[in-house]
């Protein structure tokens, strides 16, 4: 039986980064898919700590909050930098990913039609810090921090991939980010995951907007 279980809606949402991480690290996991109807009418929501998903099970450890789950996997699988300095930088980068993801989620679920144009216009300013971080680490030819992949890389990769769907060409003026996406997407296990039916057929968001 797989050691990990992801309990989540039938979308990529806040779980695709952890799926990328697990796939790339050669880990197996079980998916428990929760439909919107069962979430609203069933009892699961009342048992969830914050009344929300994802719920993540690692043996008898149950976690909520997607970034707490990523950090747990980072610690467990050696994906948290090589020392405390790198760990702090990984946290900083991941917090930046969360900031932009929150903006994205707000757009998708609350003001897509009227807000998309302004969002796309402002997007370069939100992407620039990640280009800067890459430029400060081995000329942008490695990872977001240090010389080994971290949980923040998987989170950033997912964020960039969904923005390329929202705004094709959004990375055209960011050569380091463009190369970074290509480089990480070419890692054999990530490449296999990204081309798998599970990923391809899984909607990005729950309302059909992307």
Swiss-Prot record:
<dbReference type="Pfam" id="PF02798">
    <property type="entry name" value="GST_N"/>
</dbReference>
<dbReference type="InterPro" id="IPR036249">
    <property type="entry name" value="Thioredoxin-like_sf"/>
</dbReference>
<feature type="binding site">
    <location>
        <position position="14"/>
    </location>
    <ligand>
        <name>glutathione</name>
    </ligand>
</feature>
<dbReference type="InterPro" id="IPR010987">
    <property type="entry name" value="Glutathione-S-Trfase_C-like"/>
</dbReference>
<dbReference type="InterPro" id="IPR004046">
    <property type="entry name" value="GST_C"/>
</dbReference>
<dbReference type="GO" id="GO:0005829">
    <property type="term" value="C:cytosol"/>
</dbReference>
<keyword id="KW-0963">Cytoplasm</keyword>
<keyword id="KW-0808">Transferase</keyword>
<dbReference type="GO" id="GO:0006749">
    <property type="term" value="P:glutathione metabolic process"/>
</dbReference>
<comment type="subunit">
    <text>Homodimer. Interacts with CDK5.</text>
</comment>
<dbReference type="GO" id="GO:0004364">
    <property type="term" value="F:glutathione transferase activity"/>
</dbReference>
<feature type="binding site">
    <location>
        <position position="8"/>
    </location>
    <ligand>
        <name>glutathione</name>
    </ligand>
</feature>
<protein>
    <recommendedName>
        <fullName>Glutathione S-transferase P</fullName>
        <ecNumber>2.5.1.18</ecNumber>
    </recommendedName>
</protein>
<feature type="modified residue" description="N6-succinyllysine">
    <location>
        <position position="116"/>
    </location>
</feature>
<dbReference type="InterPro" id="IPR036282">
    <property type="entry name" value="Glutathione-S-Trfase_C_sf"/>
</dbReference>
<dbReference type="GO" id="GO:0005739">
    <property type="term" value="C:mitochondrion"/>
</dbReference>
<feature type="binding site">
    <location>
        <begin position="65"/>
        <end position="66"/>
    </location>
    <ligand>
        <name>glutathione</name>
    </ligand>
</feature>
<feature type="modified residue" description="N6-acetyllysine">
    <location>
        <position position="128"/>
    </location>
</feature>
<feature type="domain" description="GST N-terminal">
    <location>
        <begin position="2"/>
        <end position="81"/>
    </location>
</feature>
<dbReference type="InterPro" id="IPR004045">
    <property type="entry name" value="Glutathione_S-Trfase_N"/>
</dbReference>
<feature type="binding site">
    <location>
        <position position="39"/>
    </location>
    <ligand>
        <name>glutathione</name>
    </ligand>
</feature>
<dbReference type="InterPro" id="IPR050213">
    <property type="entry name" value="GST_superfamily"/>
</dbReference>
<comment type="similarity">
    <text>Belongs to the GST superfamily. Pi family.</text>
</comment>
<keyword id="KW-0597">Phosphoprotein</keyword>
<feature type="binding site">
    <location>
        <begin position="52"/>
        <end position="53"/>
    </location>
    <ligand>
        <name>glutathione</name>
    </ligand>
</feature>
<keyword id="KW-0496">Mitochondrion</keyword>
<feature type="modified residue" description="Phosphotyrosine; by EGFR">
    <location>
        <position position="4"/>
    </location>
</feature>
<feature type="domain" description="GST C-terminal">
    <location>
        <begin position="83"/>
        <end position="204"/>
    </location>
</feature>
<feature type="binding site">
    <location>
        <position position="45"/>
    </location>
    <ligand>
        <name>glutathione</name>
    </ligand>
</feature>
<dbReference type="GO" id="GO:0006693">
    <property type="term" value="P:prostaglandin metabolic process"/>
</dbReference>
<dbReference type="InterPro" id="IPR003082">
    <property type="entry name" value="GST_pi"/>
</dbReference>
<keyword id="KW-0443">Lipid metabolism</keyword>
<keyword id="KW-0007">Acetylation</keyword>
<comment type="function">
    <text>Conjugation of reduced glutathione to a wide number of exogenous and endogenous hydrophobic electrophiles. Involved in the formation of glutathione conjugates of both prostaglandin A2 (PGA2) and prostaglandin J2 (PGJ2). Participates in the formation of novel hepoxilin regioisomers. Negatively regulates CDK5 activity via p25/p35 translocation to prevent neurodegeneration.</text>
</comment>
<dbReference type="GO" id="GO:0051122">
    <property type="term" value="P:hepoxilin biosynthetic process"/>
</dbReference>
<keyword id="KW-0539">Nucleus</keyword>
<dbReference type="GO" id="GO:1901687">
    <property type="term" value="P:glutathione derivative biosynthetic process"/>
</dbReference>
<dbReference type="GO" id="GO:0005634">
    <property type="term" value="C:nucleus"/>
</dbReference>
<dbReference type="Pfam" id="PF14497">
    <property type="entry name" value="GST_C_3"/>
</dbReference>
<dbReference type="InterPro" id="IPR040079">
    <property type="entry name" value="Glutathione_S-Trfase"/>
</dbReference>
<feature type="modified residue" description="N6-succinyllysine">
    <location>
        <position position="103"/>
    </location>
</feature>
<dbReference type="GO" id="GO:0006805">
    <property type="term" value="P:xenobiotic metabolic process"/>
</dbReference>
